[in-house]
Amino acid sequence: MGRGKIEIKRIENTTNRQVTFCKRRNGLLKKAYELSVLCDAEVALIVFSSRGRVYEYSNNNIKSTIDRYKKASSDSTNGGSTMEINAQYYQQESAKLRQQIQMLQNSNRHLMGDSLASLTVKELKQLENRLERGITRIRSKKHELLLAEIEYLQKREIELENESVYLRTKIAEVERLQQANMVSTHEFNAIQALVSLNFFQPNMIEGGSAGYPLPDKKVLHLG
């Protein structure tokens, strides 16, 4: 059968209260000592009796232990304040980022021609100027790319013309050699076929017009 639960309340009888205090105090001091020895803990115990007498135990200097406790309590309080300040800072930064995202989304919709009802005449004029500057930059870039493409095609045209002249010269040389009976008819036909093959293969436009021969002279104009 287990022990009954003892009700904890103030002992009214003065003598009994003093006797109980002495017993419990000694037991508490013993437990503090055992805790410090068994667990290598720094323990400080201070007890004031109802009459104002002080009893203490410390396995170290009790003042040093109290100072250490004060420092630990101060660090804990400051740490809590720092965490609170950091939390407020991150909340503010998060709110700023959400506001910036909203502004960018609104600006993007305005550039697409949406959600214009809320804009004033001044804001619409500013939006118009932004779009015009953007179109100007786009046209400038397109013009730059077109000029580069035209320059490439002109260089390619010159290369093909030079190659055409070279191949025609080769054909004329082969014909002359045949007339001089230095090349047989079979060899002449083979050389002419090879030259013709080499002539027509490079004489093609590479950029999306494959299969069509490049004219002898191309005049390119910018619109």
UniProtKB/Swiss-Prot annotation:
Give the CDD domains listed for this entry: MADS_MEF2_like
Gene3D superfamilies, sorted:
Transcription factor, MADS-box (3.40.1810.10)
- Does the entry annotate any disulfide bonds, and if so which pairs? none
Cite the GO molecular-function annotations of the record: DNA-binding transcription factor activity; protein dimerization activity; RNA polymerase II transcription regulatory region sequence-specific DNA binding
- A single Pfam family it belongs to is SRF-TF
Give a yes or no for keyword Nucleotide-binding in this entry.
no
Give the residues annotated as coiled coil: none
K-box domain location: 87-177
Question: What InterPro entries does this protein map onto?
Answer: MADS-box/MEF2_TF, MEF2-like_N, TF_Kbox, TF_MADSbox, TF_MADSbox_sf
**Which residues does the UniProt record annotate as the domain MADS-box?**
1-61
Q: Which domain of life is it from?
A: Eukaryota
Name of protein: Agamous-like MADS-box protein AGL11
Q: Which organism is it from?
A: Vitis vinifera
> Its gene?
AGL11
